[in-house]
Amino acid sequence: MLMTATHREPIVLDTTVRDGSYAVNFQYTDDDVRRIVGDLDAAGIPYIEIGHGVTIGAAAAQGPAAHTDEEYFRAARSVVRNARLGAVIVPALARIETVDLAGDYLDFLRICVIATEFELVMPFVERAQSKGLEVSIQLVKSHLFEPDVLAAAGKRARDVGVRIVYVVDTTGTFLPEDARRYVEALRGASDVSVGFHGHNNLAMAVANTLEAFDAGADFLDGTLMGFGRGAGNCQIECLVAALQRRGHLAAVDLDRIFDAARSDMLGRSPQSYGIDPWEISFGFHGLDSLQVEHLRAAAQQAGLSVSHVIRQTAKSHAGQWLSPQDIDRVVVGMRA
């Protein structure tokens, strides 16, 4: 999966079911998981993270979920066709035997630890590797340490066969220049593949993730509508749209992601997250969103995908001003 220096392709990981479950108090049903995972898989997202938001094997004190880890794993596995499935484990909060369950259903496991305590999670790393799981080390609360401390942890992880190490902006503290410094430090210390997981407390999650990619990160995390702990995560619709504008991720169906975000996530949490996917689509295509409500109504009345109508309108419309009549002509043409 590592790309050449001449053309690096980002690898997008969606954690709507895992980190996004904070936004619904860990109450996703197994039907929710099937629908969300199925939509993401169909859209071409290559890595999908599931399981309890805090950690697989979470005790009741971490917040009871609507279903067990195994029920979530089975639900996701029943619908996924192409994506790799994984979960997060926090060794300080979970029993090592939980790794065995992950090995029965999943493809990868992300092990959370602060940068100065990597040796404490070595038993979990070895157990996961013995189960054939792709292991990623998540250096949580990265902002607490200087970049060279993360670099040393990343080098140690690579020495024991770990291929992926993440910078994790747990508290949403980073600015883009911080994301760059930390990613570059990890990249410079070993040939480990670097990931970036951003939170949106300063409304910088998308900008930080793009900067992390430019600095050399390969794995980029996001969630539908930016659902997640606290202020939320990097909104995957924005992230994919921005990367596609740069010529990346041609195999990902952006319209399908827009539709999944609205159908699967809107209204699900009492807290407001993210930007309306249709507004993102208007921005992506360079259309003035003044007529978004007319377009929505016309598309829905015709039984068409709003995202598809936006895309077709952008292809057909060449003028400076988009009128309701312009939209109506597009809809009629799509129905013909």
From Swiss-Prot:
Q: Which UniProt keywords apply?
A: Lyase, Manganese, Metal-binding
Domain (Pyruvate carboxyltransferase) spans 10-258
Q: What start and end residues bound the annotated signal peptide? A: none
Please give the activity regulation comment for this entry. Answer: Activity is abolished upon incubation with Chelex and EDTA.
Reaction(s) catalysed by this chain's protein: oxaloacetate + H(+) = pyruvate + CO2
Which residues does Mn(2+) bind? D19, H197, H199
Q: Where is this site: Transition state stabilizer?
A: R18
Instruction: Note whether Glycoprotein occurs among the keywords.
Output: no
Please explain the role this protein plays, according to its UniProt record: Exhibits oxaloacetate decarboxylase activity. Lacks any detectable aldolase activity with 4-hydroxy-2-oxopentanoate (HOPA), 4-hydroxy-2-oxohexanoate (HOHA) or other 4-hydroxy-2-oxoacids.
NCBIfam families, A to Z: PRK08195.1 (NF006049)
The record's subunit annotation is: Homodimer.
What's the protein name? Oxaloacetate decarboxylase
